[in-house]
């Protein structure tokens, strides 16, 4: 019996066994915890046992199923590996909602190992050659065989199917997995960036709807989609001309392990790029062109920058230098090198130095969505994610697309001057500091949050810091350490007159107003003096419309530990 016929028969046998159970009160009983860690209902166990009996009649195989985990079926050498979800959409079946399915995927075992784990470890989802999904309630069947296209079967009538050609999200119908829904998904729904959303409750069938063009895409951006949920649908969508990746655009190719989980975006090529851009690491699908900025007053940093250039040359990867780095390196360069002229053409910015170099890079990026690869040449370097020994592995991870990007909040604002004019402030990655022009001279402020007066402050100055900057000047002034991805800001008086004037953490959506009641001050943004403010001026700060993006490296809490040891 060939693999397709076997898969079709397994699905039919499951349908015959499950249909009579609909409405039976014992179908809903939890009989055990399945191999995947979720409760197994009686209906699931019966369906799985029927599938095992169906397989035993025709072949020896390795079965991978949510309920049983791994099982070797038959006494002979296994010929096939079968990935099974006996009832996908168990809740729907128990409530007689006609949207639940049996999903079967089969691959051939060419090499046999006596050790079952060794055998399975050598197999991936790409090795599956046949996928069958049968709607148990209606009998509608979707199937595909590698290299032979995808098909839909209803009441004996067979049709070829293919994905939609929709290219505009606003015109698209999206299938969505809503369990443990993410903030990004909620925002996607709230912003109505699509025509319609559908939540059906059977991932296998929803993937088949994408394969036949009834849905334009299916997404689950949480890392919760299991092998057995998607194995059959994966084969069918691929044969229908679709793309199946994780949320970052990396092709899904799970180990054949019942506990394997992944995020999923299924669609056509045109929509896929847009969905990855919304939910994942959009930079993985952008051509790589590094920008390089280095500390130029440190010979070791210049040497590392030179080695980075040589490494990129050896890989054939494009790069451009900022002008000061170019001038520091021009006598060492062995080939023509471009100076950054259009920041939008840069995909990733490599910063070599300390936190000051990162701040220079952030200012240069000017709000564009360009991830920074930050190499620490100093001590702790809270803004730097990699040490100098990790630079080449960091570059390699970006080239091959296996990296994560962390989004961080910035500050934006303006000064409302006493003469009625406005002065727009540059965005701040770390902090805005309002400080006295003359050392040891006390200043007088009023601090407002969302229009309400919070405190009257006498101090040497005041810091408004992002979480990113909470480990810098703010920390030295007695402010709290805030994890970089937290959505908030901290207001820290510098050497306050009153002991009751303490740091204040506020929501990132708050508007912060600082009114100067006495003396002229300097407004300093990320270490650079922005302008001189006078008595009566108001500094208005809020969350920036743009964010900073960092390629993830060292764990934030590891850096805290290093700080405690200094």
UniProtKB/Swiss-Prot annotation:
Positions annotated to bind NAD(+): 355-356, 360, 430-431, 441, 458, 460, 471-476, 528
Job of this protein: Involved in the regulation of the intracellular balance between NAD(H) and NADP(H), and is a key enzyme in the biosynthesis of NADP. Catalyzes the phosphorylation and dephosphorylation of NAD and NADP, respectively. Although it shows conflicting dual activities and is able to supply NADP, it seems that its physiological role is to prevent excess accumulation of NADP.
Gene3D superfamilies tied to this protein: 3.40.190.80, Fructose-1,6-Bisphosphatase, subunit A, domain 1, Probable inorganic polyphosphate/atp-NAD kinase, domain 1, Probable inorganic polyphosphate/atp-NAD kinase, domain 2
SUPFAM superfamilies: Carbohydrate phosphatase, NAD kinase/diacylglycerol kinase-like
InterPro entries, sorted: ATP-NAD_kinase_N, ATP-NAD_kinase_PpnK-typ_C, Bifunctional_PpnK_predicted, Inositol_monophosphatase-like, NAD/diacylglycerol_kinase_sf, NADK
Active site residues per record: 355
Cellular component GO terms, alphabetical: cytoplasm
Sites where the protein binds Mg(2+) 2: 85, 88, 229
Organism of origin: Methanococcus maripaludis (strain DSM 14266 / JCM 13030 / NBRC 101832 / S2 / LL)
CC cofactor: Mg(2+)
Subunit structure: Homotetramer.
Binding annotation for Mg(2+) 1: 66, 85, 87
GO BP annotations listed: lysine metabolic process; NAD metabolic process; NADP biosynthetic process
Recorded superkingdom: Archaea
Keyword entries, A-Z: ATP-binding, Cytoplasm, Hydrolase, Kinase, Magnesium, Metal-binding, Multifunctional enzyme, NAD, NADP, Nucleotide-binding, Transferase
GO molecular function, one term: NAD+ kinase activity
EC number: 2.7.1.23, 3.1.3.-
Reactions listed under catalytic activity: NAD(+) + ATP = ADP + NADP(+) + H(+); NADP(+) + H2O = phosphate + NAD(+)
Name this protein carries in UniProt: Bifunctional NADP phosphatase/NAD kinase
Family, per entry: In the N-terminal section; belongs to the inositol monophosphatase superfamily.
Location(s), subcellular: Cytoplasm
Keyword Kinase: yes
Renumbered residue ranges of the record's region NADP phosphatase: 1-283
Annotated stretches, region: NAD kinase: 275-566
